[in-house]
């Protein structure tokens, strides 16, 4: 058996932990620079606020209904996510963190257990220790466990836990479960299936396997088998290096100056290089992009994209920043206001897999490695950005997070204060 623990409306729930006065009231959390809604409480969803809705388009709903609005506080959310994971580790020998608000639990080998009660116990213990509401689904496969956890959110009477294992129960659920909500079925795959009359997860399981293989290849077959109760998706409780890394941001104020834009891109490149080094990998290519505000139809639009190919796969700070800045100068167009920019590392491989050229200057490479290691050590001790390259600028461009809550769990100065009379 596998369990999927999914934190309900996670970012909004984190804000409520330290603001109990918001229980039962509409809450939303905004993205970088307070651009759009990325988390909504059930009460906010009921008001018609959609995921990803630009804030300026829903501001009238917010003001009319007294919706509590927060800027994203990733330090808080990351810490609360870890606290939930610590609770989950009490219930299973292995936990696979799937995302900041989801984790799989490997329950194989656990016998003579009332899994329905176990799911509810996991949920109640997460609430008791963290005050985060968690929906726990248990089923024979990871895909079915995902569906079971969704049922918990739809039906409060399940009390946060659902054990789905009997064939007749699985069939009943799959007959009503929309194909577009099945884990592993992407937008394009969904469009193909709908055009064939496949509207539910049950419809999908009734297709012949060879037809699924022809239509959606091996990933589609895995999902098909998982829905039929056959575990096909491996449990991954160890670290897996990312195959692409993107660092991007929307700007609070549009950037029209080339130096300001290249400074921002240099900082994104620095962060990307750091992420590569953290997983001991290197990138063969890097994409650099910048574009204007697509919501301003009355202003000129441009989308700039430049692909950089490294002669030698790299995670070196100076090499990556220099290449990113050069690309920024190449794609910049005068007269446009850039709203968002970023960098993406692709074709990633492990450092140990790199084949070095006979003509490579090994001494220079070793010197660059020592410099980068020293930068990482200093910034790791005294904080990110303590030492940086000149191309990264002075940090004069700040993101807008006017509605951010305190860092309750990660900064001493932000600890909640209690008055005793």
Regions found by a protein language model. Give the residues of each.
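DNA-contacting surface of Y-family translesion DNA polymerases
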Residues: 191-337, 353
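Gly/Gly-Pro- and Ser/Thr-rich, intrinsically disordered tail segments characteristic of DNA damage-repair
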Residues: 1-225, 234, 274, 362-421
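Short, charged/polar, Gly/Pro-enriched secondary-structure boundary elements
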Residues: 111-115, 297, 349-356
């Amino acid at each position: 058996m596998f369990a999927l623990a999914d934190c309900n409306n996670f970012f909004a729930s984190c804000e409520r932990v330290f603001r109990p006065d918001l229980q039962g009231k509409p809450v939303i959390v905004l993205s970088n620079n307070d651009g759009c809604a990325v988390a909504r409480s059930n009460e906010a969803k009921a008001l018609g606020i959609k995921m990803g809705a630009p804030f300026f388009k829903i501001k009238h709903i917010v003001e009319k209904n007294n919706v509590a609005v927060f800027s994203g506080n990733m330090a808080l959310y990351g810490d609360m996510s870890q606290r939930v994971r610590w609770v989950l580790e009490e219930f299973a020998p292995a936990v696979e963190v799937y995302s900041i608000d989801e984790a799989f639990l490997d329950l194989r080998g656990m016998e003579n257990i009332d899994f329905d009660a176990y799911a509810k116990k996991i949920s109640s213990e997460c609430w008791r220790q963290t005050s985060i509401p968690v929906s726990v689904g248990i089923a024979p496969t990871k895909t079915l466990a995902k569906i079971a956890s969704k049922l918990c959110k739809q039906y409060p009477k399940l009390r946060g836990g659902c054990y789905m294992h009997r064939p007749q129960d699985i069939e009943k659920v799959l007959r009503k479960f929309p194909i577009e909500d099945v884990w592993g079925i992407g937008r394009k795959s969904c469009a193909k299936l709908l055009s064939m009359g496949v509207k539910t997860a049950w419809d999908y399981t009734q297709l012949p396997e060879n037809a699924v293989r022809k239509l959606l290849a091996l990933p589609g077959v895995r999902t098909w088998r998982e829905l039929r109760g056959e575990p096909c998706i491996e449990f991954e409780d160890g670290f897996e290096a990312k195959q692409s890394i993107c660092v991007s941001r929307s700007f609070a104020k549009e950037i029209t100056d080339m130096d300001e834009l290249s400074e921002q891109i240099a900082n994104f490149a620095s962060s990307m290089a750091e992420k590569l080094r953290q997983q001991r990998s290197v990138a063969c290519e890097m994409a650099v992009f910048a574009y204007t505000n697509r919501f301003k139809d009355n202003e000129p639009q441009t989308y700039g994209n430049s692909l950089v190919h490294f002669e030698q796969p790299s995670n070196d700070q100076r090499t990556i920043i220099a290449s990113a800045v050069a690309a920024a100068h190449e794609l910049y167009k005068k007269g446009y206001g850039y709203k968002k920019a970023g960098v993406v590392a692709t074709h990633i491989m492990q450092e140990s897999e790199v084949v070095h050229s006979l003509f490579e200057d090994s001494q220079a490479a070793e010197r660059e490695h020592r410099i980068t290691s020293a930068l990482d050590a200093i910034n790791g001790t005294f904080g990110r950005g303590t030492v940086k390259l000149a191309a990264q600028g002075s940090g004069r461009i700040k993101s807008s997070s006017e509605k951010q809550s305190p860092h309750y769990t990660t900064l001493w100065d932000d600890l909640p204060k209690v008055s005793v009379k």
